[in-house]
Structures are given as structure tokens and as C-alpha cells.
Amino acid sequence: MKFVPSEFSNSAWDIFILSKEIAQNNFQQNIDSENILLALIKQDLLTSKILKKNCVNIRKIETKLTSLLDAKAKMKNKQKTLFIGETTEKVFLKANDLRVSFNDVVISTEHILYGLSYDEICSELVLNTKKIPEFLELLNKMKSESTINDNFESSNETLDKFGIDLTKSARDGILDPVIGRDEEIRRTIQILSRRTKNNPVLIGEPGVGKTAIVEGLAQRIVNGDVPSSLNNRQLISIDMGSLIAGAKYRGEFEERIKNVLKKVKSSEGKIILFIDEIHTVVGAGATGGSLDASNLLKPMLARGELRCIGATTINEHKQNIEKDPALERRFQKIKINAPSVDDTISILRGLREKYEVHHSVRISDNALVAAASLSERYINDRFLPDKAIDLIDEAASRLNMIITSKPEEIDEIDRKVLQLEMENLSLQRESDNFSLERLKRINNELHDLKIRQSELNHQWQKEKEEIDEISNLKEEIESTQLKIEQAKRSFDLNKAAELEFGTLISLQKKLKIKSENLVDSFKSGEKNLLRQEVNFDDIAEVVSKWTSIPVNNLNQSEKEKLLKLELTLKEKIIGQNNAICAVSDSIKRSRTGLNDPNRPIASFLFLGPTGVGKTELSKVIAKTIFDSNSSITRLDMSEYMEKHSVSKIIGAPPGYLGFESGGQLTEAVRKNPYSLILLDEIEKAHKDVLDVLLQVLDDGIITDGQGRTISFKNSIIVLTSNLGSQSINDLSIRNEDKNEIKNIVNVELKKFFKPEFLNRLDEIIIFQNLELNELKDIAKLQLKKLENRLIKKDLNFQITDEAIDHLVKNSFDNSYGARPLKRIIQKEIETKIANNILNNNYLNKKEVYISIKDGCIFVN
């Protein structure tokens, strides 16, 4: 007989190749029947199923075969070329005889198993010749079809290999409980019970719970909580990616799909398919003119021979399924909306026990409420309940990691002990009095530390054991509850009653006592090394990590920082007290959670002449509040003077160049939502750009070119403008009242900006012209920065009051603000110091002294 791929099915040829590898790894010269049987057991699902039905212990066979192969004679090296053993040839001849009798085209795995039953050694392990009639009868029953071509894989094997039995998972307690969603599950059951077109498709955003609804249906089928038309049905989830993967030859993928469909059809409605991401069936496997999966599904879907549940997102349904009306009409749409915050809290309460058992922690109710509410407010690019569940999962995982790791206090003592022991070894070599005295002190300190170390380690182990005991009890309770459900389903009521009213109650009492003892130890005021409960702060910490937004409760240092915020800003920004008060008040409202959650933290329009501190105040706010200079997004609005500049802000629309890049403003906020947005010189932007900002200022959101909703609800928006600066200058010179200045500037604003734009701003702040004494304070700030730069170069810096007055008088100009002062400091001081450094004038005396000499700045 020929041993070539064309004579075998794919799975049978894979078995032959694997048996060859087993023989090579065992340093054999021949491929024997034992190698074939071991390969079958390891790889073939149908063989495993047949052997299990024949009451054969597969693990024992595998162990016996391994020992038989180890006992065989071995070559010195692995053999590249192997011979077909006599026993193997007999096996394949018998397999071929069965193929002929079944009218199959190629040899498949079940034929090989039949051939092995005639082998002297293998027949003792699996099937002896007396059981061959039973085997043939079993094979006829299990085979739903004959092998029809060289790409045959039985439908049983295909379903087992590429499908997951959700009803079995529900029976085994693997699936999470499904809370709520009764209306959606009822609608799904209603469509499945139709005579034709009984195929629901669940459509919703990612993470709203489409797959969970199908899992809920599987649990209802197992519990018998469904109409008679769905009782005792199998719900099998098919993975389209796995079906396509590995289909090397043309037609192989279609064959796999056909095998699945024929198995479903032959089950006479007992099997319901679930295809997650059902949009993947459109075009799947369509290469070189072959049919795609959707065209293979359509006939059976229309006739009602196949009951299929699909799940996909709104966008994917629109892009793929709606393009094929023939496929779309065969499915009935069920819209799945994201649950409300209250519904999400109920879902989390239902899942709490599963996560507590998995992570060996306790999850408080306020943590569940925080996960739902904080995720809804701060995580805007994902959907409930998925994002809330992820928060709980990560917070519990983080706490579990802390529990299983060494506590920080013990770790610090361990490091200190190691450091002192090294110092001790070093000092033992010394003989002077100082070293001996130091050695004595170290030994005393080491003695105290080791006692403390031992006490803490004992306490840590004790607390850890208590937590582990509670965790083990929860696992036992979960396992007992599963056994009770299984006993009730199999009508073993005696066992169910014994478990429910005996074992379960006993375990619950033990858990209650242990939990109360642990809670009492926390309440007693004892200092505990470990914490077992996930609380609000844990959830807030995870949200902060994800979004960079501080949402945790304010600690004392942060409260002090916010209370002193106004003073801090006044130290860095001179002469603009009204602006500073307005900004600090807005930030205090936001950080204490009193601001409107549906608007930006604050939106300001800074007006005033050039050089009075509009942009500088924005930079100082970003540095002070967000603790980073990178938390400011600055857009120079003179770059947005054309009408088409709108696309630069929010991103180009589909079909235009740069669509994938996104907008300059929207992308910056999407990546860093907790930041300050500075739109400099807003009056220079095109009117259409201002119209785009209306929604941002009012609702705190904007839709970018790619259709994503970008949230500005955690941003401070600052717009600066020079409008009315000439009026402010003229009126300031005449010492006009501030209210008069404000009224005149407002008139100019209304001429330029639309009323709906001005009405959406929180505050319009007018920056006043700088007075001479204020400019002197600014000069001191600038010189302090210079001093800090010189200190890094080991140079001391001093300047006389006369020199400062000289700088201020020579740079004072109402029209230009503080910028001329910066220029004169650069020209008169920094340039001269730079020349002195280059001339090595500071090698001996590391001091820079600035004074006035002959009416000019003199750098000594």
C-alpha cells in the first residue's frame, strides 16, 4: 500500500506524521503500531470519544504505551529515515479494508482505530476482535456521513474541535451569573421558537453584554427555564477564526462548514449555534472563486433547519451584513443597549462572589458603586458594564498582589538588617575605639531589628493564613452550591438535601465566624499588615491609572495645596489677582466634585494687552494643578485662519488625506483628558473654528472626524485674545474705573464674537496693565530664575536694588507689558555673564555681582 497524503484524510495523515515524530524521538528505526496508537490518543478527538464510549481509560493506555516504547531497542541517534514496521503495515491494510466496505475515498482515523484492533499488542489495550461488531455498530451511529474527499474531517470532530458547548459550561458552573437582561433573553427565546428565520442577531456596542446574554440563555436551558421547544438543547459557540485557520487546500474550509451544518441538521433541532462576531462569516474563506461562509449558511437559515444566534457591533453589522440584504433578512435584529449605572451595580453585585473567590479578597459594596459611577463619568471611550467589571477585576488583582507579596514594613526592615550586617562584617576588621563603639551600636540595633522582624513575619503569616482560610471556605461553598444544582437537575433529591441543609450550612457558619473575627481584628485598632477588602480608594486608584485623572478622596496634603492655591498662583503671576481668584475657585469646585459633570472644569477668555501674563498664567496653572508642564495643549489659533482649518482641529472626514491621523485638538485630549487646553489668540481663528468650539464649551464633548466622541469634561479651557487691548491701554493711562474698562471691552467683544459663543464661557477675565511696582516684582522673579540656573554652574548671584530699578525703568512700556523686561535682562545681564564665563573670569571667584556703574549695568 502507498503511504502518501492523497490516500489519507487530513487528520489521518497528521496522525501518521505524529507517529513518525514519536518514533524518531524514541530513537526507533521502525514506525510500529504502538506509535500509531499513541499518536491517535494524543491528537484525535473522535478516537477519544469512541474509546470513552467503550469504557476505556485513555490515561492508563498512554502510560502503558510509553513504557512499552521505552522498553524497545533504541538506535544511538535519531533516524532521519524510518521504515514502516510489519505491524503498522497490517494495521493500515485492515484500515483500508474498512474504507472499502464503507465506500469511503480515503483512509480516516476511525479506519486506523479499526485496524489497530487486529494488532496483537494494541488489541489488548483498546479493542479486541470480539468487540469489532460492537465497534462497527458504534461507528455507524457516530458517523453522520461518509468520507467524500481527501479533506474529510468528521462533523463530530469538527464540532468538538471548533466549538464550545455553552450548555455544558453552564452545567459545570464555569459561566458567570447573568443578572438582569431578562427582556433581551426573552426576545431571543421568542425568535428561536419561530418556525422559519428563527435566527436572532444581537447588535450593540463592544462591552454591553451581548455574549453574556447568550450565556444567560445557556444557563436557562440547563435550568429548564425555557419553553418546551428549547428544552434539552445544546448551545454551541463556533469560533470562525479557528475554522478558517489551517485550511490549507481549496475547498477545505467549505468542507468544515458543511460538516458543522450537517451535524446541526442531523441533530433535528437539538443543536443551536452561536457565532460571536458574526460579521466575519461575510467573505470568510472566499478565495479563488470559492464560496464564503455566509452563502453556505443562507439556505439552511431561510428554511429554519439551522438555528443560529449571532452577535456583532453596530458598525460591523452596518459595514458587512447590511451590504448583503439576503443574509440580513434571515436574521432578526435585537438591539442591546448599555445598562444604566443602577443596573450595572446590580450586575456587579451578582458577579462579586466569583471575583472574591478568584482573587481571595473581599469586595465592599461601596467599591461596586464606585466602579459603576466612576467608570461612567471618567472612562468615556468604553461601555458599561464591561468597563466597570474591568475596574473591579483590576482593583481586586492589585490587592491580591499586595496580600501575596511581602508587606512594605517587613521589606524595609529586611533591607535595613542586610545593610547593618554588611557594615558589621566590615567593622570587625577594624581595631580603633571609634569602630568598636560603632560595632557595639550596630549589634544592639541588629538585635532589636531582628526581634521586630520575627514579630512582623509571625503576624504576616498569621494574617495570611486567616485570609487563605476564608478564601478556601468560599471555594468550598461555591463547589457545594454547584453540586447541589447538579443533584437537583439529576433528581437526586436526597443528596441535594444533604448538601444544602448539612454541608452548605456548616460551611457558611464557619465562614461567618472567620469573617467576623477578621473584621473585629481590623476594628480593634490593632495595626494590621494586610488588608483584605477592596474599597472606594482602590477603584479610584485604578481609574486614576487609566485616565490620569485624580478621582480618589483628597488627603490632607492635597487639601492644603488647594487651600493655598490662590497664594501659590499670586507668587508666580504678578498684578492679575482677579484672574487668579476666578481660576482657583473653579479648580476648587472641580476637585471637590461640585462642578457640573457634563461641562469642562472651567472655560475662560483672557483679555488684555500683550505681555501682561495671559499665557504665563495658563502655564503656571498647568504646572501647579496637573504637576506637569506636558499637561498643557497649546494651539496657536493664527494657524487656523482658513475655513478648511476645522479639519485640523477635529480630523479630516472619511475619504480625505489624513483621515487616520485624527485632529490636533481631539487627539491631544483623547490621550490626556486631564489637562489644560490653551487656544492662543482666538480672534485670529476662522469663524467656523469658533462654531466647532460651541459644543465643547457647552456639553464638554465633540465628535471627531472618525466618529468618536471626545470628552473635555476633565479639561480646563483657556482662550486668550488681544481684542480691546488698545482701549485698555488708553483707559488705563487716563486712570479710568475698571468697570468702565470692562464695559468698553465687552462692546468690542460683542462686535467680534457671536453671543452664543460668549454666553457659553464661564468667565471673561480682563487683565490689567502692569504698574511700575508690579514690574519690579516680575523682575525679581525673572532674576530668581537666572540665579537658579547659575547655581547649577556653581556660581553665586547678587544684584543691587539700584540695578533692578534701572532694569525696570528702562523696560517699562504700558503697551508691551513685561516682555521688554525679559529682553533687557537677556541683553544687559545674561549676555555679559556668558562672555565672562567664556573668558574664564569665574575660575577663582565663583560669584556674579550686578550693580550700577556710570548709569549702566555693570557685571563684576
From Swiss-Prot:
> In the record, what terms sit under GO molecular function?
ATP binding; ATP hydrolysis activity
Q: According to the UniProt record, where is the region C-terminal?
A: 770-860
- Coiled coil residues, start to end: 389-523
Region NBD2: list its residue ranges: 558-769
UniProt GO BP: cellular response to heat
Q: Which residues are ATP 1-binding?
A: G204, E205, P206, G207, V208, G209, K210, T211
Q: Give a short account of what the protein does.
A: Part of a stress-induced multi-chaperone system, it is involved in the recovery of the cell from heat-induced damage, in cooperation with DnaK, DnaJ and GrpE. Acts before DnaK, in the processing of protein aggregates. Protein binding stimulates the ATPase activity; ATP hydrolysis unfolds the denatured protein aggregates, which probably helps expose new hydrophobic binding sites on the surface of ClpB-bound aggregates, contributing to the solubilization and refolding of denatured protein aggregates by DnaK.
Report the protein name in the record. Answer: Chaperone protein ClpB
Instruction: State the organism named in the record.
Output: Prochlorococcus marinus subsp. pastoris (strain CCMP1986 / NIES-2087 / MED4)
